[in-house]
């Protein structure tokens, strides 16, 4: 359901994003009984997220949503634990029918923008049904070519017009400000991703606000972490947070000390980039032997020419750096 499945061992940055989500759940568990939550997500054929959620968070009530029958058959064959209910159902139909009467952790991992307006409608629908302290994580593609592929030789003005029309077609007036002003400079390779992050974040906020607007309990959605990362052809934006009233949020924020969490996003604009370098075992061992001493680490990193962004990113995320080994089974 989440698109073409690519294993985590080929997507180091996505693996780190997942580790940040797990840390966030651990942070919330200081006041919330996370183990009693129902986990809802897109398992894929290997159900790797579900295996991790059970092993690391001790969740024992989990629901996997899948539309493709062939993948659903593989899920049932690869089922790691019998506490996972693999359903052959679309996310829309599930959200429509499910009561959300029990505390929930929902991860909607979207890999394609082709149905993004429908996906946002599902988020709006979900927001009408959740309760305080329910947790929602969403992943959106932000690879510009996924929204419009610039043609060879296409002028910048023509590209801008076609790109804007594609955004209007995909998001519609419901989720896109049709008066949005886009400059030619916004379409440079360096800036266009930031533009898309802003557009998709605003669309997500709009879906949430529409869903919550008619409620009597006046809960809001509070982001904990916003991340962007690239793994090969995939450029993704992830938003993780929870629903609560303002007093509930303030109490939980103080109890869990959000502001001192290394990966806490202080605002909707605080999108943190995960871009770890690919290291040899020798390089990693050498760097790790100097950590967490930043001065010694910087000197070691300069020995094999890591650029400043790579050095800073590894220093920030080294605890979460995945370590994959080949084994004989």
Please report, for each region that a protein language model flagged, where it lies by residue.
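N-terminal start-of-chain detector that recognizes signal peptides
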Residues: 34-36, 109, 211-214
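Structural motif
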Residues: 38, 104-105
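Class I S-adenosyl-L-methionine
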Residues: 2-8, 96, 100-103, 113-329
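A structural signal for short, well-ordered beta-strand segments and their strand-loop junctions
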Residues: 41, 64, 107, 135-140
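A generic, well-ordered mixed alpha/beta core segment in the N-terminal half of proteins
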Residues: 83-86, 104, 111
């Amino acid at each position: 359901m989440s698109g073409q499945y690519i294993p985590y061992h080929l997507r180091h940055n996505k693996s780190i994003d997942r580790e940040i989500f797990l840390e966030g759940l651990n942070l919330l568990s200081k006041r919330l009984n996370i183990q009693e939550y129902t986990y809802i997500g897109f398992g894929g054929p290997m159900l790797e997220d579900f295996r991790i959620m059970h092993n690391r968070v001790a969740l024992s009530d989990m629901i996997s949503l899948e539309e493709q029958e062939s993948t659903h058959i593989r899920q049932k064959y690869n089922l790691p634990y019998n506490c996972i209910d693999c359903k052959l159902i679309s996310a829309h139909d599930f959200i429509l029918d499910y009561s959300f009467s029990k505390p929930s952790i929902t991860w909607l991992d979207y890999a394609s923008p082709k149905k993004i307006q429908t996906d946002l409608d599902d988020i709006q629908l979900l927001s009408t049904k959740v309760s305080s302290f329910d947790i929602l994580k969403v992943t959106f593609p932000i690879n510009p070519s996924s929204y419009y592929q610039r043609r060879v030789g296409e002028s910048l003005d023509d590209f801008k017009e076609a790109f804007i029309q594609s955004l209007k077609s995909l998001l519609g007036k419901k989720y896109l400000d049709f008066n949005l002003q886009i400059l030619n400079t916004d379409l440079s390779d360096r800036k266009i991703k930031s533009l898309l992050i802003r557009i998709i974040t605003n669309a997500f906020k709009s879906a949430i606000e529409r869903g919550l607007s008619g409620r009597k309990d006046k809960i809001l959605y509070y982001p904990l972490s916003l991340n962007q990362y690239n793994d090969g052809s995939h450029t993704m934006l992830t938003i993780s947070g929870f629903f609560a009233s303002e007093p509930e949020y303030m109490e939980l924020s103080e109890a869990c000390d959000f502001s001192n969490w290394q990966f806490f996003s202080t605002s909707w604009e605080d999108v943190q980039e995960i871009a770890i370098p690919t290291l040899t075992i020798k390089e990693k061992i050498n760097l790790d032997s100097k950590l967490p001493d930043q001065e010694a680490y910087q000197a070691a990193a300069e020995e094999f020419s890591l650029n400043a962004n790579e050095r800073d990113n590894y220093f920030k995320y080294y605890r979460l750096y995945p370590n994959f080994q080949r084994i004989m089974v």
